[in-house]
Structures are given as C-alpha cells and as structure tokens.
Regions:
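Serine-dependent carboxylesterase/thioesterase catalytic core
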Residues: 46-197
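Bacterial signal peptide processing site
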Residues: 25-27
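C-terminal catalytic-base region of ester-bond hydrolases, centering on the histidine
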Residues: 178-263
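Hydrophobic membrane-insertion alpha-helices, especially the h-region
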Residues: 13-17
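Short, low-complexity, disordered segments immediately C-terminal to signal peptides
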Residues: 29-35
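C-terminal motif of bacterial Sec signal peptides marking the signal peptidase cleavage site
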Residues: 21-23
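Bacterial N-terminal signal peptides that target proteins for export
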Residues: 2-11
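Short beta-strand element of the alpha/beta-hydrolase
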Residues: 38-45
Length: 263
C-alpha cells in the first residue's frame, strides 16, 4: 500500500513534537543558583531535543552535577529536517557560532565558572565547531563527545587549544548502523563519507609530530562490555542511558569542575 506524502509529513511532525516535548521540563536544572556554579550544555543529535538528551541531562543531575544543565537546540525545526541538520555544513557553522556567542556571554557574566559542552552524535560536531571558534581568552573546561558524527581525521587542534581539560571522545565499534554505514552513506557533520570517530575513534598524529603535546588533551574512551551493567549495550543511544550517565559521565564532569576557583 502506497503511503501518501501528506501522511508522512503529519507523522514526522507529530514525532518531532513528541521529541521536543520530552525536553521541556528541565527548568529546575537552569536556575540562577545552578548557573552561578557553572554550566553544562547538552547538544542533541540531528533529531533535536528528545527523550535521549533529556535522559542525559537528568542523568547528570541525578549523578551529582550541581551546575546548570541546558539542552541547546542547534537544529532546524522543519519536520523531517534531520538530514538538513546533518548535511547543511554552512548552516551548522552558523549555529556553532551562535553557540560560541552564548558561551562567551555566559563567561563574561560568570567569570571563572566551568563550561562543559557535551555533544551526542551530530551534536558532537557542533560542539567541536563551537570550541574551535572561541576566543583564546575564553576557553571552556571540556568538550565531551558521545558517538560523535565527525570524521576520524578531523583536525582537533583548534578545539583542543580552547579547552582547559581537553576533549573526551566516547566511541563504540558496535555503533555500525549509524556511524559506520550511516555516515559512510549520508556523511559526517564535516561532510566526509566515512565511518565516524564515534565508532572508530579519532586519528592521532605520530609521536614525532609537533602536535603530540596538544593531542595529549584528547582522551578516547572505548565502549567496554562492563558498561552493559549500566544500560549501555554499545549502541548509538546507549551513551544517554541514565544509569550510564550517572556512573560514568556525571563523575567526570564533577572531577573536571573547579567550583572553588572563581575569579
């Protein structure tokens, strides 16, 4: 039976609204008191604000992160716009610049506070683009990448320079559907058709390279079968499972934080 195009659009619109509604109840994580302690920005994948990044934000809070936690919607609201979010490179650079401006404004208003940017899937690409655009005098604390849809040979040096604690790349070779076949066919955020760094990790320069010291700020964490005990089966969305976030990501953010080092 042939599906009418209008039906597809309606179903897509309803699905998009359901995803968006899941992320609308985080106001208690964005209070002025929390913003005074620091800021964690969660960047969704190409699906936009959703159940998965809501779980990620809640898992951080439940795991003891006391900073403000916000979901930053960088994607288009057009129904069925996921491919636009993946493929519109110049638009994505513009959205990354807007995120950079948002971060700089926060740091001006809250000097010395920590800012951590956590990007899932396509949001990982936006996180890196925004970090590399930051002014040298406004570094952020860290970038945490979960199943990042960036090419493995992407040059991380500009982003690494603008992070105090570095970039943490969480990847899984079991993420073959989205970040193996998917990005090989549809492309990565940086528009290369290849398995993504969220599946195979980022390339590192050789030990003789002058960039070796800078790349020491890149930490790569491969999915481990032990993570199954916390709801993460190695799949694309497993990084957002609340139990995994509480056990692995919340302690990392807390460890990287500097709550007593305000200027």
């Amino acid at each position: 039976m042939k599906t009418h195009p209008r039906t597809v659009l309606i179903v897509t619109a309803i699905f998009s609204l359901l995803l968006l509604s899941a992320a609308c109840s985080l106001n208690d994580l964005k209070t002025p008191e929390r913003r005074e302690r620091g800021l964690v920005i969660v960047l969704p994948g190409i699906e936009g604000p959703s159940y998965w990044n809501y779980n990620l934000a809640r898992g951080l809070a439940d795991g003891g992160v006391e900073n403000a936690i916000e979901i930053y919607d960088w994607g288009t609201r057009i129904p069925g716009g996921m491919l636009i979010n993946l493929a519109a490179y110049e638009r994505n650079r513009t959205m990354a610049a807007s995120l950079r401006d948002y971060i700089v404004t926060y740091l001006k208003d809250h000097p010395g506070r920590d800012v951590h940017v956590i990007g899932h899937s396509g949001g990982g690409g936006i996180a890196v683009l925004a970090a590399e655009m930051l002014p040298a005098d406004r570094p952020i604390s860290s970038v945490i990448l979960l199943a990042a849809a960036l090419s493995p040979d992407y040059d991380l040096r500009p982003a690494l320079k603008n992070t105090r604690r570095g970039i943490f790349n969480y990847y899984s070779q079991l993420d073959a559907a989205f970040l193996g076949v998917g990005t090989s066919v549809a492309g990565t955020i940086d528009r290369k058709h290849t398995p993504a760094a969220g599946a195979v990790g980022f390339d590192r320069p050789g030990s003789e390279s002058a960039d070796g010291d800078l790349y020491r700020k890149l930490q790569q964490i491969k999915w481990d079968p032990k993570m199954r005990g916390y709801g993460h089966m190695g799949d694309h969305m497993g990084w957002t499972q609340p139990a995994f976030v509480r056990r692995y990501l919340a302690p990392l953010v807390a460890e990287l934080g500097r709550p007593d080092d305000f200027e």
